[in-house]
Amino acid sequence: MSDIDAYAQMLLLSNFLREPALRSAIQTLQLPAGSRGLDAGCGIGLHTVLLAEAVGPTGHVTGLDLSPEFLALAQEQAKTRGLTAQSAFQEGTVNNLPFDDNTFDWVWSVDTLFPTLANEPLPALKEFVRVVKPGGSVAILFWSAQKLLPGYPFLEARLDAAFAQMAPYMAGIRPELHFLCALGWLREAGLGDLSAYTFVADVHAPLSETVRQALIMTFQMFWGEARSKVTPEEWAEFERLCQPDSADFILDRSDYYAFLTYSLFRGTVA
């Protein structure tokens, strides 16, 4: 399996966990029927199709991504859901959008503007503002928290403190560039009428096989490289709880419950 295919599979699996929170976010935005929007950093189109459903048959959503391979998969998503007339996909970068001023009624972007030492969010946000009509909105969202190991809060806190789980937030980045400070970014980009919300997606036993696989993948994605950051005893406990072949595999518990959150930051173009 290629790196592209592996990452696409990860996105598909994790979507079973994320989609309820993102649907709630879309509902809160109350996107006007018939409006035209941009999904900036659309990946394989999983959110683009939800947005296209929300704006209805007279609306339209353009998905933008750097990866032509992801865009091809996004087109398949739209085709499968019968939404090809309401969606289009274009290659491009969020820092230099290939669209005219005042093209869209709104922009939506999920897990795309995480700052790094080499890339800050403001240039992309200014581009979002440029392509949105006056009175339109810009909404950016981030996976902001999760609790996946019920009954083991200290172990989960230690695992979460491992650098691999904190990525893409990196040591050396100014505190105001943490994604939970995104209202400040929106204000600096010239947006007004700012608001922020957090949405929860939760799962509980009995788990479907798809959700089990998504959680197993999430355990590995967050904590699979944390061994050097925790004690040998903590790592042994992690493996006891999070390895599917363990007699104490946590997903086999009849009382298993977990949740994740997405935080949305929204502003209006003057």
Predicted regions and their residues:
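Conserved alpha-helix/loop element of class I SAM-dependent methyltransferases that forms part
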Residues: 16-33, 50
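Class I SAM-dependent methyltransferase SAM/SAH-binding core
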Residues: 38-40, 44, 48-96
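Short glycine-dipeptide loop
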Residues: 57-58, 132-138
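A short acidic, Gly/Pro-enriched loop at the edge of an enzyme's catalytic core
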Residues: 95-107
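A short SAM/SAH-binding and catalytic strip from SAM-dependent methyltransferases
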Residues: 105-120
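A short glycine-rich, Lys/Arg-flanked "PGG" loop and its adjoining helix->strand segment in the class I
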Residues: 122-134
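Conserved catalytic/acceptor-binding region of the Class I
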Residues: 139-207
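Conserved Class I S-adenosyl-L-methionine
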Residues: 180, 195-270
